[in-house]
Every structure is written in C-alpha cells, then in structure tokens.
Amino acid sequence: MDGNSTHPAPNLKTTMAWSRISNQLGHWNDRKVIAIPLSDFLNTHPDIQSGIIAEFKKATGEEGMFARDPESLGIMLLGPVKLFKPDSVVVDGNLFWDPKGIHASAPKEQQKKAKIPRPPNAYILYRKDHHREIREQNPGLHNNEISVIVGNMWRDEQPHIREKYFNMSNEIKTRLLLENPDYRYNPRRSQDIRRRVSPYLKIKLLNYDVNGNLLWGTVNAEDAALIRTHFHGVVRVEEMDDGCRIVCRPVAGSRKLRAAVVDTWMPRYTVDTTPVTEDDDAQAFNFNDPLGGAYFPLNEHLWITVNQNPPFNAPPPNPNPHLDFVHPDGMEAVVHNVQNMIAQVQEANEAAALTLPPPPPLRLLSLRLWLMIPLTQLSFPL
C-alpha cells in the first residue's frame, strides 16, 4: 500500500486536529482560549502543534501559544500570547508554557480598575470619631439611632470644631486629587440603586388569621433583620435552613402588628407592657380610633369596612392610598382625611334616613274607647 495513503500529510492531520477544537471559539468565548485534553496534546506531533498555532492565528488574528492549566492538571490551554504571563518558563519556541502553579490572567487593558473611594466629607469624619463613643455609652442602640444622635451633636457643635473637620475633609480631597488626577465622582443612576422596601410592606406579606392578626411568616435573612429592627420586641425571629421564621409574640404584639398593617403612617411599634383587660380584647386595634363605634358604609376610599370576613391567610385590608407609608403632607392631611370620612359617614346615614317610610300619623282615641277605660287608670295633671 502506498505510504502517502497510510500516513496522511501533516497539513491534513493539522486540519483534522484543528476542526475538533475550533468549535470552542464561539461568540461566548471572549478570551479566545481553547481547552485541550492533556493526553491528546502529549500524543500530538510537534509539527501538528505548530500547525494548530498557525490555524489559531488565522482564526483569531493573534499569536497563540500552549499553556498548562494549574487549576486542572489534565487540561492544556491554547490562547493568545498576551493573555498569559510573560515571566513564565517558555520552551519549544513559545509553543509550550508551564507556569507550575501560575495560571492565565486577563490582559492589563481588560482588567477592571480598582474603584477609588469617594473622599469623606466633614460630617462623615465627625461621625467616625464619635460613633464608638456613643456605642460604648449606649450598647443597645441601633446604628440608625446612633446616627440621629451624632447628627444632633454635629448640628449643635461649636464653629471652630466644625471648621476643624471641614479642613480635614479638604486636605483628604486635595491629597486624593494629587494621587489620582483623573478621579471623577460618578454617582449611581437612580435605576441602578436598589430600592429598600418598607418593613411595613414586608409585614403585610406574612400570614394572618381571619381577624387580621399575624400568625407566622418566612422571609430571608435581610428582610428578617429589617423587620426585627422596626418591630423590636413585637416579633420573634427563628433562623431555619430555608430562611427566617417570623412569629408574633402573644397578645400585645399581635394587636400592635395589626395596627401597623392598617395604619402604615404610624411610627415604630414596641411591646405594650400594660395588662390585658376585657376591653382590650373587645377592641379591634390597640390605638385610639377616631371613628370608633361609627357605622361604615361599603366604600373603597375608607380605611376599614365592617361585616366582611376575609378568607384565611388573607392580608389585612389595604390602607388609604393617599396616606402612603409616610404621608407627604404630614399630620394635617391625615386629620383632613379623617374629617372627610366622618362627613361621608354622616351623609350616608342621612341618605339612609330619607329612604325610610314615614311613621304612621297619630290618631286620637274615639269616644267609645275613652268610655271603656276605667277612671282609676286615668291620671290628669293638677
């Protein structure tokens, strides 16, 4: 048999070898790196390896080389020369690279520059100096409460102390601009900022009984921390494998949580330590209701409707959409809404009174009936 037919030409072997690995150069492979089994690479003739390098240059337009992958010892990498570190041992005319523990890295022009932190302003420096002191004096305070205290201190601080921190802030900013002349502050766009959901809304998504009282609910760790902060002492957080279980504390906590989901403009709730009485059990909510005892017609604009039992596990009724979580117009707008609701109730009652049939007219007793009544049962004013 002819030798040429028994042993194919090297260029044909190169084409066959390249066709088996070239399908890895898809649009998803932006690094242009091909993975080759180490056993196949070791069984490949050096001339075929050189041919594969040439085919790689034709396909990508860049000089290629082989490199050992330290993360997977059974894999050989084929990629651009600039992708691999130049201080490694290179043999066989730049065809093979064995870093012995050093793996490929992205080119310097593709590496993302480290983000330069924004220089702190005067208040941030002031807060940094006083935060630890406030925490040591009040170990139970939340960071938000500490920020309020430090903010009041900064507002009432002496002018020379404030000027000191303003000078410190200007020095830090000047030093940063000298070290990074190209620095520009680029704030995040509004659509890129993750919106924080109100803890009252998260409480609404939990499970309630037919009377609107919180039973239990499962949320993630982040939501559990938010609920624990705003409803401290009212709920109990139990950590589980699939999340955190929110359980309402007995009696007072359940009433206050029901008030929270109905009146979302009300402030943060804490545990009510007063003993429970029969009057408290009879009340629907544990706060002063300006419309207590009034008759409510079925009106979607009112906070509450009566004689409607929600299904099991249904959330409480939605509050007035004009109130939102914190009413933008303050307490005056809330009082105005309450007055409007009272007026609506009065108008509804007056309209119902007009539709009732008139009472029968008063008729005088006939003389015959008068004669039938004994005189002893009649009484006349003197």
Curated annotation (Swiss-Prot):
Instruction: List, alphabetically, the GO terms of the cellular component aspect.
Output: nucleus
Ranges in coiled-coil conformation? none
**DNA-binding region, residue intervals:** 116-184
- Gene3D superfamilies according to UniProt: High mobility group box domain
- One example GO MF annotation: DNA-binding transcription activator activity, RNA polymerase II-specific
CDD domains in the cross-refs: HMG-box_ROX1-like
- Subcellular localization: Nucleus
Q: Per the UniProt record, which residue ranges are transmembrane?
A: none
* GO BP term (any one): cell differentiation
* Phenotype for residue 258 to S: In a-1m33; abolishes vegetative incompatibility
Q: Which Pfam families match?
A: HMG_box
Q: Which UniProt keywords apply?
A: DNA-binding, Nucleus, Transcription, Transcription regulation
Subunit description: Binds in vitro to DNA containing a specific core sequence 5'-CTTTG-3'.
What does this gene product do?
A: Mating type proteins are sequence specific DNA-binding proteins that act as master switches in yeast differentiation by controlling gene expression in a cell type-specific fashion. Transcriptional activator that induces the transcription of a-specific genes like mating factor mfa-1. Required for mating as an a-cell, blocking of heterokaryon formation (vegetative incompatibility) and for perithecium induction.
What is this protein identified as? Mating-type protein a-1
